[in-house]
Amino acid sequence: MSNGNIVQCIGPVVDIQFPRDKMPNIYDALTLVDGGEKSFSEKGLTFEVQQQIGDGVVRAIAMGASDGLRRGMEVKSTGKPISVPVGPATLGRIMDVLGRPIDDAGPIATEERRAIHQPAPKFDELSPSVDLLETGIKVIDLVCPFAKGGKVGLFGGAGVGKTVNMMELINNIAKQHSGLSVFAGVGERTREGNDFYHEMKESNVIDKVAMVFGQMNEPPGNRLRVALTGLTMAEAFRDEGRDILFFVDNIYRYTLAGTEVSALLGRMPSAVGYQPTLAEEMGKLQERITSTKTGSVTSIQAVYVPADDLTDPSPATTFLHLDSTVVLSRDIAALGIYPAVDPLDSTSRQLDPQVVGQEHYEVARDVQMTLQRYKELRDIIAILGMDELSPEDKLAVSRARKIQRFLSQPFHVAEVFTGSPGKYVPLKETIRGFKMICSGELDHLPEQAFYMVGSIDEAIEKAKKL
């Protein structure tokens, strides 16, 4: 192990001079020797080497606040990448990017550690899966079903309900699912992390969840690496032969942190100011989130869509890696329909008659066709009114409006805001309900009976009271 000295500080990016023959490798972790008493900088501050500039100088990014750093301070090379604790001792704990506990519950009692940079599983180790994962959310189970061991993205702009949807999925899947979960909070609000922790605690599933946070207020180094920290913990459980749920909120902030770091390192930006290595960074992370023959990782990732533009390079790069995409729409949220999932924009590789069965496939396609017809007729209705439509079109519009309202559902996690108890709807009930609407069995019921109910029987009961 060699020691070096800081020669330049520019925000979180620090240049460190080492002896020429003892330069640390790329991604090696370095620690500050002088911190703590001698200055107000963080004690034992960790850096990660990003570039070797030459002449013994390396450029590193700080994994913590770089306040109080100055030239000449001594830095020690650890000779290995950042490693974090893994295994059962991490369950029920909240950790930061370096795997240090931040929940005031004492140290993490495990000797087992693993480097956060790992190669993706080899091609012959991968295990594709076609088992469906029931979420209890009607619109998702019907139009964009999830696969066990698959990858799911929740896409949406600001304030359309990504985090609430994510929390409901955690509530419905993680509590029913007997396996373990890992939650990585990447560059999101600290308040949401706090809410998540208390929710898990109240529902007594905290002992099955490991939580890693690198929130909005932290330097870009933390936000860039915290997804890898969470993933490393999930991989360790997977390699023991377990089935893991891996939640990431939010993948966009991972990209954004990469953009900040890239600019600080002096790389030329590419389209829209993103880092030139955007596709490679995303690929490195996403290729590791996968199921092997030993165990499975089912990942659910929230993806912020800047300015509601799905063609922005960051969400567009994320799309490539996913099995199911759940697109949240501001127009649907404006109608007061929650979850605001767009059934025409959301897709799933699992929506195939060989996977979900013929009945499910046909009902889902009927629902989409009816909604698509309504979308096409909307301009005519706006100009000429409903009276000018043919009887078939009037019927299609009436059914589409019922379907649209029946796609809404009260959530368990939103009970405090809505006052209506959350509903978990089994897949069979979902298919039966939409089949009845599409076949015309419920044409006589008013459309408001279908709004914010669980199963179709509740809608029929509600219609009697109207």
UniProtKB/Swiss-Prot annotation:
Binding site for ATP: G156, G157, A158, G159, V160, G161, K162, T163
Domain of life: Bacteria
Pfam families named among the record's database cross-references: ATP-synt_ab (PF00006), ATP-synt_ab_N (PF02874), ATP-synt_VA_C (PF22919)
Catalytic activity as recorded in UniProt: ATP + H2O + 4 H(+)(in) = ADP + phosphate + 5 H(+)(out)
InterPro entries listed in its UniProt record: AAA+_ATPase (IPR003593), ATP-synt_VA_C (IPR055190), ATP_synth_F1_bsu (IPR005722), ATPase_a/bsu_AS (IPR020003), ATPase_alpha/beta_chains (IPR050053), ATPase_F1/V1/A1_a/bsu_N (IPR004100), ATPase_F1/V1/A1_a/bsu_N_sf (IPR036121), ATPase_F1/V1/A1_a/bsu_nucl-bd (IPR000194)
Record-level GO cellular component terms: plasma membrane; proton-transporting ATP synthase complex
Single GO MF descriptor: ATP binding
Gene3D superfamilies: 2.40.10.170, Bovine Mitochondrial F1-atpase, Atp Synthase Beta Chain, Chain D, domain 3, P-loop containing nucleotide triphosphate hydrolases
Residue pairs linked by disulfide bridges in the UniProt entry: none
Keyword tRNA-binding: no
Main localisation: membrane
Membrane topology: Peripheral membrane protein
EC number, UniProt record: 7.1.2.2
SUPFAM superfamilies linked: C-terminal domain of alpha and beta subunits of F1 ATP synthase, N-terminal domain of alpha and beta subunits of F1 ATP synthase, P-loop containing nucleoside triphosphate hydrolases
Compartment(s) of residence: Cell inner membrane
Keyword line: ATP synthesis, ATP-binding, Cell inner membrane, Cell membrane, CF(1), Hydrogen ion transport, Ion transport, Membrane, Nucleotide-binding, Translocase, Transport
Assembly information from the UniProt record: F-type ATPases have 2 components, CF(1) - the catalytic core - and CF(0) - the membrane proton channel. CF(1) has five subunits: alpha(3), beta(3), gamma(1), delta(1), epsilon(1). CF(0) has three main subunits: a(1), b(2) and c(9-12). The alpha and beta chains form an alternating ring which encloses part of the gamma chain. CF(1) is attached to CF(0) by a central stalk formed by the gamma and epsilon chains, while a peripheral stalk is formed by the delta and b chains.
Alphabetical list of PANTHER family matching this protein: ATP SYNTHASE (PTHR15184), ATP SYNTHASE SUBUNIT BETA, MITOCHONDRIAL (PTHR15184:SF71)
Primary role: Produces ATP from ADP in the presence of a proton gradient across the membrane. The catalytic sites are hosted primarily by the beta subunits.
Protein family according to the UniProt entry: Belongs to the ATPase alpha/beta chains family.
Protein name: ATP synthase subunit beta
Organism: Polynucleobacter necessarius subsp. necessarius (strain STIR1)
Lineage: Bacteria, Pseudomonadati, Pseudomonadota, Betaproteobacteria, Burkholderiales
Gene: atpD
